């Protein structure tokens, strides 16, 4: 995402992306935006991992599809560590979350890590949630960031985007109906 920072002004990105952007792309962090509790690990219902998710032996040698260098990789490696395993025990295939879900539903891979509304799509397609950041008790903080050019030349628009983001999140938290509507709108547009 940071590699494409010339094509955007403001973004919501996980902590690894923020650090990468600040270090390598002159991106400025505006603030924390959420703790993505819906960052989850899924498998197929008929898999050995679904039948015995805490057995380290069923995880050895599997292929997990996820975007590498992200909070999803952090979450997956934390789960493996809880089983006494590491990245050396599995194959990780790098893929963005939406195409990853499509590929997984088409039979690719043995496990899938996705976040936000894509996690709802995974559940809707019958996949089994093995764990998530909340269950693992880990932090998965995301932040809002902007390019230096946008901060200098479009500060009014950055301020407006920042306010709309937080007001929308506040609205989402007001009721389950609001959150369901937000998820539906997100899935339709992404």
Model-inferred region functions:
Residues 17, 118, 150, 178:
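Flexible, active-site-proximal loop/turn residues at the rims of small-molecule/cofactor binding pockets
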Residues 33-43, 123-150, 154, 158, ...:
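Periplasmic-binding protein-like
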Residues 152-190:
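Secondary-structure end/capping motifs
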Residues 81, 123, 187-188:
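Short polybasic/polar patches that bind polyanions
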Residues 1-86, 91-94, 110-116, 129-133, ...:
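Short, glycine-/small- and polar/acidic-enriched structural segments
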């Amino acid at each position: 995402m940071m590699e494409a920072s010339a094509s955007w002004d403001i973004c919501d990105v996980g902590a690894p992306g923020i650090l990468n952007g600040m270090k390598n792309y002159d991106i400025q962090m505006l603030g924390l935006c959420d703790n993505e509790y819906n960052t989850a690990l899924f498998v197929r219902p008929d898999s050995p991992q679904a039948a015995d998710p805490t057995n380290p032996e069923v995880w050895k040698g599997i292929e997990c599809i996820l975007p590498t260098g992200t909070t999803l990789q952090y979450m997956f490696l934390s789960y493996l560590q809880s089983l006494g395993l590491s990245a050396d025990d599995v194959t990780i295939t790098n893929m963005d979350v939406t195409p990853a879900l499509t590929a997984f539903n088409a039979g690719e891979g043995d496990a899938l890590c996705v976040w936000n509304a894509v996690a709802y799509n995974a559940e809707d397609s019958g996949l089994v949630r093995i764990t998530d950041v909340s269950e693992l008790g880990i932090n998965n903080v995301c932040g809002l960031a902007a390019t230096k050019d946008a901060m200098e030349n479009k500060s009014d628009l950055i301020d407006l985007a920042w306010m709309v983001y937080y007001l929308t999140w506040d609205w989402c938290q007001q009721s389950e109906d609001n959150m369901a509507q937000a998820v539906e709108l997100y899935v339709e547009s992404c």
